Amino acid sequence: MLSIYNTLTKSKEVFKPLDGNKVRMYVCGMTVYDYCHLGHGRSMVAFDLVTRWLRFSGYELTYVRNITDIDDKIINRARDNGESFDALTARMIDAMHEDEARLNILKPDMEPRATDHIAGMHAMIQTLIDKGYAYAPGNGDVYYRVGKFQGYGKLSRKKIEDLRIGARIEVDESKEDPLDFVLWKGVKPGEPSWESPWGAGRPGWHIECSVMSTCCLGDTFDIHGGGSDLEFPHHENEIAQSEAATGKTYANAWLHCGMIRINGEKMSKSLNNFFTIRDVLEKYHPEVVRYLLVSSHYRSAINYSEDSLRESKAALERFYHALKGLPVAEPAGGEAFVERFSTAMNDDFGTPEACAVLFEMVREINRLRESDVTAAAGLAARLKQLASVLGVLQLEADDFLRAGAEGRVDAAQVEALIQARLAARAAKDWAESDRIRDQITAMGVLLEDGKGGTTWRLAD
């Protein structure tokens, strides 16, 4: 039975879908003004993991992840680039999809874009005005009346009184309360805009997600997810808008993933301490990056370093060495491993414990391959089956272990030298055999002699 940590209740609770075996999940996606950094990759992989485990467990999941394609940052970047905002977002959306494909991230079932839901935003804003939760001061803006919503702060545990005392908010005479947030922004010169009942303008960030999520999944759905940095104010404001508009619970459970940190600080573009996914993939195999992101618990912060990536690479090499050379088989055996893996994953998607189970399977595969290759092959297939939940170990072992060889060594030359060494060994010319091995080693290649013959991989 799956238990999840619900940020709304600040407790771990048994997951009970609203509608039998069907699960509806919405996750806040990217604001597409630049290439995705590794922090975005963290969120992508975290909710890809949730998606994979829910489906592996037999749930019928509808996964929606939005794209924010109109925003101050987008407008400013497009202006700096001398291009239209939609040309910029089209390029960045394509780049995001390329990054996701390389990290083996499954596509969401729906990927709504904010600019396709302007009419829905108008409708929700008008409902909020009609119910007294929003007001239009006459300058083209529309604001949400925070003080009217009795449940404000229930997600973040922040109190309105404390926010007013602690906030440094610029005076805006058009607001009734400094904490009120914008639902609709009146048009400014040179900015994209849409007509509305309150004049030309564009939506605020928070209303975008309220409308896209409820449009795709209904007024109430099972899971809302995102990075922990979105808990306040974004997700708090989503709840305030949505529940005031519909009179219903917005999302039953809230999942928040941890941040990537560099020297203890959150990785972000605003702090200029970020690495794009593309930067990292220039140096490391995509599966190494994915394993780094998925092997830590999704709610934990990950401290990014070259050492952590090297550790991820070494872990995957252990897995692939165990798989290497075994015949293709159907998953067989390992029922106790499956049970323990499932127990770990059902405990709030506990990937550290799940990975520990996979390493125990590696030890058993290595033990079996010396005495029972058939059993070893069946257990290896089981290992790959479970690892598919993490989105790893789906490559051919040699392909991963030789990754990066292009441009570094001549594979044909290595293969020719291996054949020459085998001939020398067959002729019992041990000196020549050793000389060839030394030559291959000097090329940065490691040889491994086994029952199935000699294989090779790049040295670290």
Swiss-Prot record:
SUPFAM superfamilies: Anticodon-binding domain of a subclass of class I aminoacyl-tRNA synthetases, Nucleotidylyl transferase. Keywords: Aminoacyl-tRNA synthetase, ATP-binding, Cytoplasm, Ligase, Metal-binding, Nucleotide-binding, Protein biosynthesis, Zinc. Its EC number is 6.1.1.16. One of its GO terms (cellular component) is cytosol. Binds 1 zinc ion per subunit. Pfam families: CysS_C, DALR_2, tRNA-synt_1e. ATP binds at residue 269. A motif ('KMSKS' region) lies at residues 266-270. It catalyses: tRNA(Cys) + L-cysteine + ATP = L-cysteinyl-tRNA(Cys) + AMP + diphosphate. GO terms for biological process: cysteinyl-tRNA aminoacylation. A motif ('HIGH' region) lies at residues 30-40. The keyword Lyase does not apply. Zn(2+) binds at residues 28, 209, 234, 238. Belongs to the class-I aminoacyl-tRNA synthetase family. This is Cysteine--tRNA ligase. It comes from Pseudomonas savastanoi pv. phaseolicola (strain 1448A / Race 6).
